[in-house]
Each structure stands twice: as structure tokens, then as C-alpha cells.
Amino acid sequence: AQKWAEEAVRDGVVESIEEQSGLYPMVSGFAHPMVTIIDSWGDSRISASFESLLMSLDHPYTKYLIKKNSNEITNKKTGAVLPANKKIVGIRSGTLVGDGQSYGQNQRQAYSGIDPEYLNDAPLYLVKFAEVDFLRAEGALRGWNMGGSAQFFYERGIRNAYLDEPQYVYEYNDLVDAYMQREQPIAYVQQDPMGDGADWPSVTKIGVKWNEADSKETKLEKIITQKYIALFPLSTEAWTELRRTGYPKCFPVLNTNDGDGSIPQGELIRRVPWQSTDPIALQNINNTGIPALGGPDLQATRLWWDVDAPNF
């Protein structure tokens, strides 16, 4: 990994916002898919772990990108009512959300989504400048020649991690300086306004500000946590980082028994099992895929880079 990373830096990597790569949905004549999924389909909401992470660090996205609850939410146990537009409300991963995709059928439709004003014109990133900087920050932390220090790439990555189309960059820039000075997290408690689960104190115990006195593990947690946020809403890459490093820290997943039965309670899915009804594809899976996987074709089986071992 070190050899390839250093070769990549020598040959040239993304060094500016202008060099990052992405697809612009509106230019191609269609809406940003996350806007369609959240607003049109009513099929997705912010996770409670992401809510807690952003709120614990007082991230700029909590001020403008993530919407507050869109309607009243009534606690099924106490009858208490959370008024509309009161707070950011996420859903615990693994929650049985129930049927219905309208607010009249399902109160979870009122949980927090993303403000389409800031997302609709944003690109679907393929390679993001900030992601490259966080990769270089981790490499430098490991002692690799990345062309600069871990602190330099970490801080530049945060400054260029915004999701927005250029006309909205000022929203992020107005807040990022104070954000980068945060040394300790806010003592945040995540609460489900419907009363379906217990209150969960934040598992985020790091700040944002770089500190050379931190251990390598804490520095890595800071780098990957900021990288995870910067990747939003590219969930595939963020999921990869979470599995590879264990960061950012997230709430335990609920109802893991609803998977294929291989995931221990509270753990996350390590991979998506192969699915095929084609005889030739099934033959290839059995003959080459399973041996290469090194384990059963289950959700809990780790891929070769997802090692259950210390990061250092």
C-alpha cells in the first residue's frame, strides 16, 4: 500500500477543487438522486449516528444542509409532541420503520432529510479533492512520503470538504474556522421523538482541532471521521472506511437478526452477499468467488482489507 500510495503522489493526484471529478445531474437534465430518494420517494432519512456525530462536533452542515423535522412527531409512549422544524432527528440504523411513505401513514417521514436547495445542484463526486487530502493525511501519519504533513492535509481536507455547488460555499466557509478549533465534542444525547428506543449518549469522544500530542490512533480517528463526513452522501466509500478502520464510531445497529443471521447483535454488515440466479454466474461464484473470499457468502464475512486487527 505504501509503495502504491507514494507512486500515485509522485505521478500526480488531485491538488485543487478544479481537478476533482464528478457528475452534475442538473446539467444532464435530471435531479440529484438523493433528492429524488428523500423528497420524491420519501425513502430515506438521516441516520441517528450521523445526527449524533454532526451535532457532537457542531458541524457546519447542522446549520444549513440537514433539515430539522418537517412535521410534528408524537411520542407513542408519553404522548409528548415535538413541534415541526424543532431539531435534527435521525433514525437508528436497523430500526423497523413500519409501513407507509406519507406523513399521514408514518411519522418517520417527518424525520430529518437534506435540504434540496443545497443538494440538487451538487455533483455526484467520483474523486473529491478533500478525499484525496484525507488519504494523504493518513499516509503521512503512517510515515509515508505524501508530499506534506498529516496536519496539513487534514486541515486542507476539512476546508475543502463542502458538498455544495459554488454559490453556497460561503455557508460552509463562514462556519469552518470555528469548527476547526473545536478541541472537545459537545455532550450530545440522541433521542427518538417517537419513543421507540432508549436515549443514546454520543459515542464521539474526539474534537476536530489537530493536536500533535494526540496518539496515532486518535489522529487516525480524527482523519477518518472528517473523511467520512466529507464523503457524504457517497455511502459506499464511507462504508468502506468504517469497515477498514472502525471509524467514525457509530451507534450499535439494531435488529441485526433481520439479516442473514450471521451478524452479531450491534455489529454492521461487512459485505453484500452475491445474488444470482444465472447458472453460469453461480458456477463462477462457487468455483472462484467463495475460495477468494476466504469465508462463507454471508453478510458478516470480512473482505481481505477489512481486518479484525489494530490499525497500527
For the regions a protein language model found, what residue spans apply to each?
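Structured, solvent-exposed acidic/aromatic patches
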Residues: 1-169, 213-218
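C-terminal functional modules
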Residues: 162, 166-312
